Every structure is written in structure tokens, then in C-alpha cells.
Amino acid sequence: MPYANQPTVRITELTEENVKFIIENTDLAVANSIRRVFIAEVPIIAIDWVQIDANSSVLHDEFIAHRLGLIPLTSDDIVDKLQYSRDCTCEEFCPECSVEFTLDVRCNEDQTRHVTSRDLISNSPRVIPVTSRNRDNDPNDYVEQDDILIVKLRKGQELRLRAYAKKGFGKEHAKWNPTAGVAFEYDPDNALRHTVYPKPEEWPKSEYSELDEDESQAPYDPNGKPERFYYNVESCGSLRPETIVLSALSGLKKKLSDLQTQLSHEIQSDVLTIN
């Protein structure tokens, strides 16, 4: 078997926003499965239900609701404790399966009033817009991080609403995608020729390239197979990047375990039927 050894992982960079790591001794199918799990199977919290009580802005209600759903919310401290709303015993919403937000803004000045994620008031200090995190403790921490614009109001216009954030994952809707981007490459020097460059010498080199400065791509390797994968996982801010990776691998492991259990039951049932 070409990949009989256990896969190995090496982290090359870890910041507040992204993590870069290398996985070796595996194949392309496994590597791509991991990438897809990062995007679609890691649960976070996002606004899913909106009741608009007053809206005299230029945007229709559905535009407002859509924008609210895409505002990333901090989920690190609560996502594992919150139930999915479909599994909760409550009739609509409760603290066990949701977080309530309110917004009440009216423009009384001649100057345009920007309604942003900062105006969203949460009933839980653990679930707030990512851009509002740590503002109360140190207002200088996020000076360069602008609040997310929802709508602009002119004098006399108002927006008043109530919303509930729920737990979900990216396979249901993009607002539950914890990543801003997930990328991996496996042939930094293009030795496999899976990519054809019109002018290789003009193409920017990968940060993982091992070629000399005067070389544009490696010699063609017709028998080569991808077995080393360079990942870059960027978080949208809802979860720390390392939390995304660990949660994704845990979810993938559970899926494989459930599949193994189900297959074992099927095999035992067939054996009993034959006997």
C-alpha cells in the first residue's frame, strides 16, 4: 500500500486568524475530505430567525435579515454547550438552544446614521458580533477592525427588530461556515503538471517551493502522486483556527465510527439471517 504509514501533521504557523499546517503520508481523497469538513461540518452560531418590528430604511426586511445572518458571532465558549434547535424540547426558543439579539436605532440628526453590528445587543456576553469582542476591556484592540454595516438611516428613519441566533453548520447554510477560506496545495513546484502555465516563468512561486530562483517549475514526474498537503485555514472569527481544525477532525472521526458501527450491525444481521 502506498500510504500504509500513519499520517503526520506539522504546524508551520498559528495566529489569531489562521493556521497553516502540513499533512504527510496520506492521499488526495483524504486531504480533500478534511478540507470539506472544515467548511461544512464544524458548528458555529449565527442569526437564523428575525422579527422586524419597524423598518423605514431603504432596504426591504429580507435584505436586513440576510445581512444579520452573515454577521459572524463569537462561538468559542458556548457552541459545544448549546443544543441544536431541532433537538431542543422547547416550543420555539430558549436559552438552551438560542441567543436573543435586539436592535433599536432611530436617526434623529441630519447626518446619516450607520447601523452596524455594534448596535446588536445580545442577552449573552459570550455570543456577540466578532467585531465587538474585547471592546469593553480595551477599546484600542480593535481600532482597525471596522464594525459590519447593516444599513444607513436618514433623519426620521428607524430600524427595530428582535433576532435569535442558533447553532448550525455550513452544510445547512453558508452563514454557519466558520471559515473565511480554506486552501491546500500538494504540488508547489508543479512537478505533476496538474496545472498548465502559459508562461511558467511569470507565474508566482508557492511559498513552499524548493526551486532555485532561476527555476520556474520542477521537471515533470509522470509517476508522482500527491502525498504531502499544505493547508491554510482562515477563520471568520467565530472560532479560533485551531478549534476549527480539532472540531473538524473530531466530527470526521465520529462519522467514520458511526459508519463502522452500522456496518457491524448489518453484517451481524446478515449472519443471523443466513443461520
UniProtKB/Swiss-Prot annotation:
The modification Phosphoserine is found at S124, S257. Signal peptide: none annotated. Residues 203-226 are annotated as: Disordered. One of its GO terms (biological process) is transcription by RNA polymerase II. It comes from the Eukaryota. CDD domains: RNAP_II_RPB3. Coiled coil: none annotated. Keywords: DNA-directed RNA polymerase, Nucleus, Phosphoprotein, Transcription. The keyword ATP-binding does not apply. Gene3D superfamilies: DNA-directed RNA polymerase, insert domain, RNA polymerase, RBP11-like subunit. Component of the RNA polymerase II (Pol II) core complex consisting of 12 subunits: a ten-subunit catalytic core composed of POLR2A/RPB1, POLR2B/RPB2, POLR2C/RPB3, POLR2I/RPB9, POLR2J/RPB11, POLR2E/RPABC1, POLR2F/RPABC2, POLR2H/RPABC3, POLR2K/RPABC4 and POLR2L/RPABC5 and a mobile stalk composed of two subunits POLR2D/RPB4 and POLR2G/RPB7, protruding from the core and functioning primarily in transcription initiation. Part of Pol II(G) complex, in which Pol II core associates with an additional subunit POLR2M; unlike conventional Pol II, Pol II(G) functions as a transcriptional repressor. This is DNA-directed RNA polymerase II subunit RPB3. It comes from Mus musculus (Mouse).
